[in-house]
Amino acid sequence: MLYTAEILTIGNELLTGRTVNTNASYIASRLTLMGFSVRRITAIRDELEEIASVIKEILGRSPAIVVVSGGLGPTYDDMTAEGIAKGLDRKLVMNEDALRELREKYQTRGLPLTQERLKMALLPEGAKPIRNEAGIAPGFTLNVNGTDIVATPGVPREMESVLESFLNHMLTRRPPVYYYEESFLVRGVMESTLAPHIKGIVKETGVYIKTHPKGHETSEPYLEVQIAYSGENPDRVKEIVRSVKERVKAVVRELGGTLDRVQNP
């Protein structure tokens, strides 16, 4: 069974170029390795109506999971929880479990729970907090008509902590889907020459094959060929990838190319 996923990253700094969106790359990689097919990555500003609108739009496509990153902190422009609540037409409520976590973290440091700090415990009605082991603001999750919404902080180490906690929990709830890929390097065959052969193999097998140019198309053709597949049986997935890999390598040889530094023998 194919599980689809979407990623929503929130923050003005992502749209101005001040911050490189490394969170999206990390999340996409982790979801892919878990067998999800990531269909879209969206980046938007810290705007309440925009967050609400995009959440509605994403849910209309019914992905298995949407991971949201950013906007869970104590400042005026941290409005992800409120935006998600608005998009779901739910109330924003004080979550007792999130409040307990915040109280514990601030009291340990001898600090009071100000209104700004209490704000981080306001979650959409029905949401379950995810403990943030790397920082303060808790993440949260809720399921809407079969779609898991997972909200994580924007600070990379905190996003990773919250996301990994959720994914580890998810493994106990859903049958695993395995992702596997291998790649090898090709010299002496232009991408445009190899393209029709790749297209035919993809159409026949359903396996993902991608060529990544590393040299000049005509004067110095040099390609990385990536082959990837997902499925519920890990041994079968590897077998399919390796079988297709051998077919592509045979085509490369027929076209007069050479194989260089196989990365995943």
Swiss-Prot record:
SUPFAM superfamilies, sorted: Molybdenum cofactor biosynthesis proteins (SSF53218)
Domain of life from the UniProt record: Archaea
Stored HAMAP family: CinA_A (MF_00226_A)
Family: Belongs to the CinA family.
Protein name as catalogued: Protein Msed_2121
Provenance organism: Metallosphaera sedula (strain ATCC 51363 / DSM 5348 / JCM 9185 / NBRC 15509 / TH2)
